[in-house]
Structures are given as C-alpha cells and as structure tokens.
Amino acid sequence: MKTYRNFVNGQYVDASDGKTIPVVDPTTGEQYATAPNSGAADVDAAMKAAADAFETWRDSTPKDRSLALFRIADAIEARGEEFIALESENCGKPVGITRSEEIPPMV
C-alpha cells in the first residue's frame, strides 16, 4: 500500500500528530494508500514555508522565474505518464481523459 506525505519546505513530512487518512479509489471503493491527516499546525508550517520561499521568488529576475517555470514544465512532461496514472486513480477518471485534458495543459 502506498503512503503519501506532505511536501513542505523541500522535504516530505508526515502530519505533526502522525495521523493518517485512507485514500480510496472512487471507482472501486478500495483503499490504495494513506495520506497525512494534516491539521492547523501543519497548514501553518506549510504557509510559513511558502511565505519564506516567496521572498526569494519575488526578488528573482523575470528571466530566472521563466527558467524555473520551464524546468517545472520539463519535469512534469518527463513524468507525464506517472502523473496521468496518479490523477486517474485519485479521481476515478479514465486514463484517456486525464491524458488528453488534464496533464498536457499543465505543461
């Protein structure tokens, strides 16, 4: 069974209290993973990390921001099939719809 974690400040972390919730495939009703059951303290930590990161982003040049966004797009494209499978499983969408309507527009 898969175990998902929060991604905060460049690191994968569990909920601060260690609690998890089941992740269920909506097409079968079967649990296929667990995810952190994040609370207010987890949200506050993520918000602080995002605000701190924004300082660097805000002060970067448009060229640097553009290059960073292109690198993100390249990474999404390189792992496209993985994202398609995850999104289909998470939402219960057919893979074909996810492949044509969800992931490509992100890139």
Task: State what each model feature region is.
Residues 32-107:
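Glycine-rich loop-to-alpha-helix module at the N-terminal edge of alpha/beta enzyme cores
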Residues 1-34, 67, 71:
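Terminal low-complexity tails and localization/encapsulation signals of metabolic enzymes
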